[in-house]
Structures are given as C-alpha cells and as structure tokens.
Amino acid sequence: MKAHYGGQALIEGVLIRGRAGAFATVRGPDGRLVHREEAIPAGRRGPLNKIPVLRGVLALGDTLSMGSRMLMFSADVAAGGTGESMSTTSRRAALGAGAVGATVFAILPNLIAGRLRRRKPQDPPKGGIGQSLLEGGVRIGILIGYLGAISRIGEVQRLFAYHGAEHKSISALEAEVPLTPESVQVFDTAHPRCGTAFLLQSMITSTAVYGFIGSRSPFGRLATRVALIPLVAGISFEVLQFNARHLDSGIVQALNTPGMWLQRLTTRQPTDEQVEVAIDALQGAMAMDQRA
C-alpha cells in the first residue's frame, strides 16, 4: 500500500497528517498518551487545491497553521496540562512568529550577500543571477549552521528523535511491515518527503526565481524577496510532489540526496517509547482516513 502520510515532530510527541486531517499523540509527564485530532474542512479540499503552484501555497499555509496549533498543544501536555488551554492569541502568536521567521530568512541572506559584494567592486552590478547565487549560498549556509547549532541542545535532540520516529513509522507503513517498535526501528531516520527537504528545495528554487528578477535598488531586492515567498513555496511543493511520484528514478534519487543528507542534522535515533508514540499517531491518522 502506497500511503502518502506526512507529519512533524512535536514536544514529546508526533503529528501525522493524512487525507482527512491530522492526528497528534503526545506523551505526558505521567507516561499516558494524550491525543488530539483535527479534520481538514471540505472547503480546503476544493478546486483551488488542484491548481498547480497555488495548491502548494495553500498547503504550506495549512501546514504552518495546523503545525503551530499542534505544537502549542504538545507543549501544554508535556508541561502537565490537558492540551485544552490554548488561547486564540497564543495560536496567532505562534503562526505570526513563523511568518516573521520566514520573512527574516528571505531578507537576511540578501543583506549579507549585498555586503559581501560591496567589498568586491570588480563584481558585476548587484542583482540578477550573480546576486541570487551568492544569496543562495549564504541562505544554505545559514540553514546548516542554525540546524547544527540547535542540534546540540538536549531538548532539541529529543525533538529530533521524535522526528526520526515519525520517519521510521511512515517508512514501515509504506513497506507494509507490522507497525511494532521492533519492525519500525530497522528503518532509517531519513525520509524523502521530509519537510527538511522542502526547506532545501525552497532555497534552490528561490535562487532560480530571484535570479530572473534583478534590481539595483536594495529596497527593491528586499521587497521582491518577501513578495515572492508564496511563489517559491508553490514551485518547491510541485517539485517535491513530482519527486515523490518518481522515487524509483535514479535521477530523482540523486536530486533527493542533499535533502536526505541534511536530515542527519534534523533527526536522531529514537527510543522504543518514542517509536510507540509515532506509531500511535500514524494509526490515529489512518483511522481518520477510514472514517472519512
């Protein structure tokens, strides 16, 4: 069975997304498993979600929104709460923080690249392909440095272990093996449809897109970087969707290799208890699909 489930790591838990919605499982301080499910409204599965590129923008918005809510839920449960105390303000703040982070990540490489090029007056004018390539290198360098730095934090290492458990459980399902900790643990912590690969693909896409839109004005470059974030996300989504449908292709496997390597920074080997949480979340998402 080729089931296309995805998900993300939560604080002491895992979120799995299916066709009908998302199911989160979080282990509380007392060891009990706390669940939360969120169905995808029928309107979000309408005709707009079939339009290439646009569907990627909509999917990214849903992913960020739902992921933020579930992350807040997991934080509350992990702290000993019930997961029901999230306020609308807290949810909006989490989503806003993600939007601000994406904007800063689009702008900062441009500023750094501009500073580097000003030190080399023999270079061609700012903007265009040269500027975009330099930005792309800076952007990827920032990402790798950031992931490498936070991966040394103990709490983040646990989060990354749940990330690995999520990948292992989905790989086991796709391989049609029993969903038990023993069977799941034999799989790799990396997965070709991982969100980490989406980040890397977005950076590659942004380098290509920004390369065709040159501007001598620093403000113009910054404005276009922010304005084109949805387009970059939509194109990146389509590329990953294509790759997911052609995983048996040697070319696609080669293209996926950098993303698989990058996951060595964002995943860790999980314990059996962490794998149990991932399996529970996956089974919950499967049950939602069966009821839909």
Task: Tell me the role of every PLM-derived stretch.
Residues 1-79, 130, 134, 152, ...:
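Divalent-cation
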Residues 49, 53, 97, 141, ...:
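Residue-level detector of alpha-helix boundaries and kinks
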Residues 47, 60, 64-89, 118-122, ...:
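Multi-pass alpha-helical transmembrane bundle typical of ion/small-solute transporters
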Residues 46-57, 228, 232, 271, ...:
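Short, charged, low-complexity patches
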Residues 2-16, 116-138, 145-197, 242-247, ...:
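Polar-ligand-bearing catalytic/cofactor-coordination segments
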Residues 57-63, 68, 90-117, 127-151, ...:
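Hydrophobic alpha-helical topogenic segments used for membrane insertion/localization
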Residues 82-99, 182-197:
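Soluble-to-membrane junctions at the N-terminal ends of transmembrane alpha-helices
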